[in-house]
Amino acid sequence: MATGRRLSMILLLLLLGLASGDKILFQGFNWESWRQSGGWYNLLMGKVDDIVAAGVTHVWLPPPSHSVSTQGYMPGRLYDLDASRYGTSMELKSLISALHGKGIQAIADVVINHRCADYKDSRGIYCIFEGGTPDGRLDWGPHMICRDDTQFSDGTGNLDTGADFAAAPDIDHLNGVVQRELTDWLLWLKSDEVGFDAWRLDFARGYSPEVAKVYIEGTTPVGLAVAELWDSMAYGGDGKPEYNQDAHRQALVDWVDRVGGTASAGMVFDFTTKGIMNTAVEGELWRLIDQQGKAPGVIGWWPAKAVTFVDNHDTGSTQQMWPFPSDKVMQGYAYILTHPGNPCIFYDHFFDWGLKEQIAALVAVRQRNGVTATSSLKIMLHDADAYVAEIDGKVVMKIGSRYDVSSLIPPGFHLAAHGNGYAVWEKSAAAAAAAADHRTSSSASL
């Protein structure tokens, strides 16, 4: 258990990190969290101190509303937070309040591409929506569905602006009532009545960036709005990703541009980096540099707008849609927690896999040395069995099976964190400060 003095110092670092623009995200759930006896919100409440002690600045929570699916990704009555399988509205508000008390922002998982209806119309089709309030907010009919979603619509709506979602009605986001009422709902989630600070946009491929911009700007100021834009990469005949994934990351960068660029809170999950890392750590670390000598994902082009991650509830957890090699997970964290971009830690790895101390140690190195989303990156080695990089001239990291890379470590650097297949060094001054902080904390606990 951290001492009161230690927690105060951590809170100060968190606030300084938020002020400087440095973000450490934490996905606070997995695909099976809804099964938790006693409620997931209550379980997570008991882990807030561990999360804050790891230097986290933002916690991503599951979809909060009533949903046909237990995980929350088939929402219906959006204002009904008491029908969530993760807990009650009061438990959610208490959790958010606890996070705020530690200087942590809460990210809502916003599922607005599609929506499930409560009632059938005269055709016998489920397309009459109930908002979850006594009044008419979000009480919609089939004319609020995209007309090319022929399974559900009555043919009067606008065409869909993005990819189809077959399992539920695709909402017509060009409809003025839809835009206004969804914006009002988001503002309610952001208000003191609930308390969310930021958005994760689920299945953002389902509607255009211009539509996303409406909701981002309509809820400004918002801490961040990170979009899930998961598209297939380019693959070769051997089934592995092509070396050049510029087209893949260009699509992500284009989305950021179209929602407002630098002036917008819009960000993207860096699926390009995720896909390249999945293969690179399996003895192909030469992939971690592009043709211009930069990182090959979105972090190589626009790191301030990239949220990097190792796995999430879809790619990992029990779904295993695109899992990171399980024996190399800490190599993934050594990469994202030392590199530019905005890293996101996954609940399973931190709590269930027993990696809490190793991950927290990497975050501490990052924050101690002032590494941020826009830090400079110098790639020193990119062989099949070893990747070495220097960040801001303050941190050097290595991943891969090769043990000895000592010839690349600059004078005055000392080992700060290490584990299976990874090592991180920092300059002596930072190492000395960390040791002094540890001695102070130890003395305070005596």
UniProtKB/Swiss-Prot annotation:
Gene3D superfamilies: Glycosidases, Golgi alpha-mannosidase II. Binds 3 Ca(2+) ions per subunit. Ca(2+) 3 binds at residues 149, 164-165, 168, 170. InterPro entries: A-amylase_bs_C, A-amylase_pln, Alpha_amylase, Glyco_hydro_13_cat_dom, Glyco_hydro_b, Glycoside_hydrolase_SF. The active site is at residues 202, 228. Ca(2+) 1 binds at residues 113, 160, 163, 170, 206. Its cofactor is Ca(2+). GO terms for molecular function: alpha-amylase activity; calcium ion binding. Ca(2+) 2 binds at residues 130, 133, 135, 139. The record marks 314 as: Transition state stabilizer. Keywords: Calcium, Carbohydrate metabolism, Glycosidase, Hydrolase, Metal-binding, Signal. It comes from the Eukaryota. GO terms for biological process: starch catabolic process. SMART domains: Aamy (SM00642), Alpha-amyl_C2 (SM00810). Residues 1-21 form the signal peptide. Binds starch not only at the active site, but also via accessory binding sites on the protein surface that are important for efficient binding to starch granules and thereby increase enzyme activity. Important for breakdown of endosperm starch during germination. Monomer. Belongs to the glycosyl hydrolase 13 family. This is Alpha-amylase isozyme 2A. It comes from Oryza sativa subsp. indica (Rice).
